[in-house]
Amino acid sequence: MIDNDRFRTENIGRHLLGFHDVSQNKVEAVANYLRSIRPEREVETYSDDFQNVFENCNEKLNTCSALFLCTGDAMTEKFVIDAFHSDNMKQPTFILWLEPFGIAGHLVYINPMQMPKNFVLYKDKGSMLYKYNLLAPIEYEINADRFTKKDAGCNGEYALYSGNDVTLMLSAFYPYINKLIQQPEQSKCYRWVGNIKLAQEKGFKLTIEVSSTTIGHVEELPL
């Protein structure tokens, strides 16, 4: 596990950890949580930026069976994609994140052995908005302050969604992740439909017609 952040009170509503873990390094606290459930489990942690760990421990990282990138940070995701394009990333990678308010969840599966050349995930380099977002691009432009909340005492910010949204998304994606780990396939994307009724209530524009889908639906899309 790699993360240079510390656990804060505002993280509690959507995390495995609780009040007794506040101010601890997230990776160390999560590692202790996992060991408390499975003492025999081997958990290795890095309290650092992914970019630094990749540069300093690239050989070791590339021995892993898969990489799960769950930062929600576009620059880290771009770093990983650039590493694929330059042939420096060798292991299958799963990129997961939720859109604000849990309106949609996304899974990008990249298999370095079966991926299109020079693939892109974003509509354009300027906005760095994912090409399969359910929220319309204009909503990210005009509602940026409504979609994120700043961490108290630091310069970071995070999208608004609940722990329940995370559980629902992961439950929907798990069968696909398990299958792809066991039987690697062509690189692809998946989109989980979440709180679209909430999007309607708040008047948010979507990139699809609500009548064309259902809550909980998982759609496979090309990388």
Tell me the role of every PLM-derived stretch.
Residues 49, 71-72:
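Short beta->alpha linker loops
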Residues 12, 50, 98:
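Hydrophobic pocket-lining residues within nucleotide cofactor-binding pockets
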Residues 2-4, 96:
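The conserved SAM/SAH-binding core of class I Rossmann-like methyltransferase domains
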Residues 32-57:
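S-adenosyl-L-methionine
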Residues 62-66, 72-223:
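Glycine-rich phosphate/adenylate-binding loop
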Residues 4-41:
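Glycine-rich phosphate-binding loop and adjoining beta1-alpha1-beta2 segment
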Residues 15-16, 59, 109-110:
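Short low-complexity, flexible loop/linker segments enriched in glycine and/or proline
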